[in-house]
Amino acid sequence: VSSSAASDVYKRQEHSYAGCCGMPYLEQADLDQVTKQAQLVSRELNKYIEKGFKVVTLTASCGLMLKFEWPLLMPNDGIVKKLSQNTLDIDEYVMDIANKEGLVDGLKEIDGGVTVHNACHARAQNMGNKARDMLKLIPNIKLDVVERCAGHGGTFGIMKGTHDIANKVGKTTASTVKRKNNKYMASDCPLAGKHIKQLAEDTNIVSDEAVHPIEIVSKSYGL
């Protein structure tokens, strides 16, 4: 996800990032390193929670780690628990603003339809499809939703021994994206989005780079 796009949208709302969440270590079963990351990052972020701030994650995988995986690994750590209770996915956070305060005026129509992929790590957060809800705020948007696994699975999709399996799993999702024939393809997991884009490139139907939904909102604002 483009951190600059996220920053642009936040600034537009007059709202105001500590270390890796450790998901790559989790995928390699290095639980000791995940625990170290959780301890380090949670203590740093807790400084802001104590001041009344919320923590916003820019990718679905990071949000899943902070909200669910860290507390499972460290159930007796009060700071980790507090962090999980005060963490929001970026799409979730924007929708919280939209529902409570309303977004700042200025969202405009965009120059093509959007297929939004609701990534597995977003669905696992049990927050509903916030990416879809957020994109629906854009006037007259043509929006299609895909809720199937991209097959990437973090490092699973880039490792030589599992890459072919990742491609097989993702083929159906990529075929669905092709059929939608929209200009933009967005996913709240950047690796899933890029994987789908690579699988769909042979027909060149997905003409633009795979992006995060917040980048579509940024484009709608003209930022």
Task: Give short role names for the model-derived ranges.
Residues 1-10:
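Single conserved hydrophobic/aromatic residue that forms the stacking wall/gate
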Residues 28-32, 69-76, 131, 160, ...:
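Short secondary-structure boundary/capping segments
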Residues 33-95:
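Phosphate/diphosphate-binding loops
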Residues 120-131:
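Active-site glycine- and acidic-residue-rich loops that bind
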Residues 157-213:
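C-terminal structured "cap/appendage" subdomains that terminate the fold
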Residues 77-106, 147-153, 204-223:
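Short, flexible loop segments at boundaries between secondary-structure elements
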Residues 11-37, 64, 92-95, 141-163, ...:
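Short connector loops at secondary-structure junctions
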Residues 11-17, 47-52, 139-148, 173-184:
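Immediate flanking context of iron-sulfur cluster ligation sites
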